[in-house]
Amino acid sequence: MKSLLSLLGRYALTLSAVAVATLVAFIFWKQYAQTPWTRDGRVRADVVQIAPDVSGPVSRVAVRDNQWVNRGDILYAIDPHWLKLAVLSSQADVEAKRHEMLMRQDAARRRAMIKGVISSEDIQQTGSAASIAAANYQGALTALELAQLNLAHATVRSPVDGYVTHLRLRPGDYATAGETKVAIVDAHSFWVVGYFEETKLSHIRVGKTAQISLMGFDSQLIGHVESIGRGIGDSNDETGGLGLPDVNPTFSWVRLAQRVPVRIQLDTMPAGIELVAGLSASVSIMP
């Protein structure tokens, strides 16, 4: 009898252990299924690529690599010598055009005063000449304004608060208008993108709270889902010969869930965390 009770006790203990293990496994599975998470996350930021509006040799670089800059701080300057000459030339042209305009207008007034003596064609010609001179004067003023603007743009300033990154510009380098010479990471633009499996998207909604863990820090960041990506690449969408779709002739029976980018806006930033664009992150979306 004792042996039977002992055997039943062992069976009961085993069944209890299995039941507890099953319950724990179910709880973890449910949490995994209803709390989307991914280790495939990245810290992102807007990188402002700054190009000059005028071309010329760089005369001064006012910043260092990885330096903090405020909006409006000078980054570098282009040699302004030829730009100053352009301003002086435009000023001289404005003065010449102004004198010509005044002379033509005076001639038109004098012709108008004696219109009974001279022909109407002569009056019209002098009036047209005065109008053309006035238009030329306005054109000279515009050219002067453009020359002054180019001179002002010889000094390149930061449009945002942030960090100079990957600086390779040196005095003496030639800067071409429209060609990026300095890049700045906008300090106020950091966000996190998490790549979630498509099977988890049904549990992700805009506005839901997100917990972010960075690989290099112990503290967690808190944010919320700002948006969900609406498109990812398709390898079968390439264009082949004759403009026809180039569809892969083979199909793998092992179907892996596609990953969709989810943008996370950061809400709280613990002290001591220095965000760097490109850092690895794990992201969990709260129920």
Where are these regions (language model features)?
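Surface-exposed patches in structured soluble domains
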Residues: 39-43, 57-62, 68-74, 136-139, ...
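Short, solvent-exposed secondary-structure boundary/capping segments
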Residues: 231-244
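Hydrophobic alpha-helix/coiled-coil detector that fires on Leu/Ile/Phe-packed helical surfaces
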Residues: 26-35, 189, 195-202, 209-221, ...
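Membrane-entry signal-anchor segments at the cytosolic-membrane interface
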Residues: 1-19
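Short, conserved beta-turn/loop elements at beta-strand boundaries and strand-helix junctions
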Residues: 47-48, 63, 169, 228-234
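N-terminal beta-strand block that forms a small beta-sandwich/beta-barrel module immediately after a flexible targeting
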Residues: 17-64, 68
